[in-house]
A protein has these predicted regions:
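Class I (Rossmann-like) S-adenosyl-L-methionine-dependent methyltransferase catalytic domain
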Residues: 1-41, 46-47, 52-102, 131, ...
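A short acidic, Gly/Pro-enriched loop at the edge of an enzyme's catalytic core
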Residues: 101-114
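Active-site micro-motifs of SAM-dependent methyltransferase domains
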Residues: 102, 121-122
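A short beta-strand submotif of the Rossmann-like class I SAM-dependent methyltransferase core
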Residues: 116-119
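Short glycine-rich, flexible loops that bind phosphorylated cofactors or substrates
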Residues: 122-123, 155
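A short, conserved alpha-helix within the catalytic core of class I
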Residues: 123-135
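Short glycine-dipeptide loop
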Residues: 140-146
Length: 223
């Protein structure tokens, strides 16, 4: 699977080069809702996984948040940094290249919230996802929020294309990991799920879960 994710990186690099506005210029609806949830708790320090072309990271920065944004595509990181400079947001946005399979380069309890939009749908095994979620939990402050979206097993593309194991299918060269409710519960690892709902996005449309979890006091408990 490591080789497959490495191949996916090359595919995304090419995609970003050919279509710099692939996901549109404005923020995602998930990004807007995440901002509302984080702001309601008077939190400001956000870590975004898989920033892509930066639309949500830049939106968060424009709305008063301090954002560290990670992506495994060098082209994506460069594009986010360039856009932040153009918008005079460099002081609020720090873009870094990072592979989610590696430990996060931050100290424990560094952030108020972690956020990602469809990042966990990449070609990651369940074990790799569990590692990534544990790392997110490690860098969250007490009662911090982990907000993410994933495509569901009810998505029109689930079951299409080439089966790659563990709920993953390759469609048009992209490997997508589809989530059922059981996987969402498993990855929560006892943390409180404070928001959970299904929604649609795009022309297909994609069917997604929106999940917001609160870091509990003790790993593996819900208290």
């Amino acid at each position: 699977m490591k080789k497959r994710l490495d191949e996916q990186r090359e595919h995304w690099e090419k995609t970003f080069a050919e279509n710099p506005d692939l996901f549109g210029a404005g923020p995602s609806e998930a990004g807007r809702l995440a901002a509302d949830l984080i702001r309601a708790e008077n939190r400001t320090e956000v870590l975004e996984f898989g920033g892509g072309q930066g639309r949500d990271a830049l939106f968060l920065a424009r709305n008063g948040f301090r954002v560290r944004v990670l992506d495994y595509s060098e082209r994506a990181v460069e594009a986010i940094a360039a856009m932040a400079r153009r918008l005079r947001l460099s002081g609020a946005v720090d873009a870094l290249r990072h592979d989610l399979r590696d430990p996060l380069p931050f100290a424990d309890e560094s952030f108020d919230a972690c956020y990602s939009h469809m990042l966990f749908c990449m070609a990651l095994t369940t074990a790799e996802l569990e590692f990534a979620f544990a790392e997110a939990r490690r860098v969250l402050r007490p009662n911090g929020l982990h907000i993410y979206t994933v495509r569901t097993t009810e998505d029109p593309h689930c079951g299409a294309g080439i089966f790659r194991g563990e709920g993953m299918y390759e469609v048009d060269g992209f490997v997508v990991h589809f989530f059922g409710r059981e996987k969402v519960a498993r990855l929560a690892a006892g943390d409180e799920i404070v928001r959970f709902f299904e929604f649609e996005e795009g022309d297909l449309p994609r069917r997604l879960f929106f999940v917001a979890m609160r870091k509990s006091g003790i790993p593996g408990t819900s208290g």
